């Protein structure tokens, strides 16, 4: 068992580990149990009854949270010509081609999201070993490989988050900050819940959502009722 500090233990006392909370109760509690000395991120963890090894059960996508993420995302765009102009106009922080490839190969990673046109993916592919392990590789399923660069950049800046089932059949996604109101957190939670429900593979068996928990950075987990997420 990992040892926790006094602040964590004090926060954990507010959570009944045997209770399954409603969404509204959980969002109230996640704010109350945050003890970080910064505006902590609120994360949701879903455990699903899917087999990620099966190609048709690999759940992945993105959505724009109605109230954003509370974080300013630094966006890199690989594009040329009109698409590069679109990216700059839409507010991309860095736009380029071979110059950006070289910069990243030299160790620069001061960004949060990478967007690329399909034509640029051959060049971006050379960065697979660098971007892949950090979850930064552009992908059509998350809307980050596209010809509509303007839309992609604006979505990221508006609060787009990605969701992806991992090897343990879990999805971990941020839904905001503890400074958000309870209603804002509930609305963001609902938006993520809806896309995860819609993404249920036809071949998935049994109870699709096995468990759900929310937590603030460093804070204790708060379990929700997976059968009552309204």
Curated annotation (Swiss-Prot):
InterPro entries: Ribosom_uL1_bac-type (IPR005878), Ribosomal_uL1 (IPR002143), Ribosomal_uL1-like (IPR023674), Ribosomal_uL1/biogenesis (IPR028364), Ribosomal_uL1_3-a/b-sand (IPR016095), Ribosomal_uL1_CS (IPR023673). One of its GO terms (molecular function) is rRNA binding. GO terms for cellular component: large ribosomal subunit. It holds the Pfam family Ribosomal_L1. GO terms for biological process: regulation of translation; translation. SUPFAM superfamilies: Ribosomal protein L1. Keywords: Repressor, Ribonucleoprotein, Ribosomal protein, RNA-binding, rRNA-binding, Translation regulation, tRNA-binding. PANTHER family: 54S RIBOSOMAL PROTEIN L1, MITOCHONDRIAL (PTHR36427), LARGE RIBOSOMAL SUBUNIT PROTEIN UL1M (PTHR36427:SF3). Part of the 50S ribosomal subunit. NCBIfam families: rplA_bact (TIGR01169). Binds directly to 23S rRNA. The L1 stalk is quite mobile in the ribosome, and is involved in E site tRNA release. Protein L1 is also a translational repressor protein, it controls the translation of the L11 operon by binding to its mRNA. Belongs to the universal ribosomal protein uL1 family. This is Large ribosomal subunit protein uL1.
């Amino acid at each position: 068992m990992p040892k926790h500090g006094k602040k964590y233990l004090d926060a954990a006392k507010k959570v009944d580990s045997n209770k399954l909370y409603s969404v509204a109760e959980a969002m109230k509690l996640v704010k109350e149990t945050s003890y970080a000395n910064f505006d902590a991120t609120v994360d949701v963890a879903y455990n699903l009854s899917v087999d990620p090894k099966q190609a048709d059960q690999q759940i992945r996508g993105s959505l724009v949270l109605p109230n954003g993420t509370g974080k300013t995302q630094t966006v890199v765009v690989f594009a040329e010509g009109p698409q590069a102009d679109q990216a700059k106009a839409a507010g991309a922080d860095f736009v380029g081609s071979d110059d950006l490839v070289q910069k990243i190969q030299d160790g620069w990673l001061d960004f949060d999201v990478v967007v690329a046109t399909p034509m640029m993916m051959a060049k971006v592919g050379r960065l697979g070993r660098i971007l892949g392990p950090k979850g930064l590789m552009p992908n059509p399923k998350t809307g980050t490989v596209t010809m509509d660069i303007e839309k992609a950049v604006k979505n990221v800046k508006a609060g787009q988050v990605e969701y992806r089932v991992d090897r343990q059949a879990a999805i971990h996604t941020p839904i905001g900050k503890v400074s958000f109101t309870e209603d804002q957190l509930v609305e963001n939670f609902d938006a993520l819940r809806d896309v995860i429900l819609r993404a249920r593979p036809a071949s998935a068996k049994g109870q699709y959502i096995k468990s759900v928990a929310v937590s603030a950075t460093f804070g204790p987990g708060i379990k929700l009722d997976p059968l009552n997420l309204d």
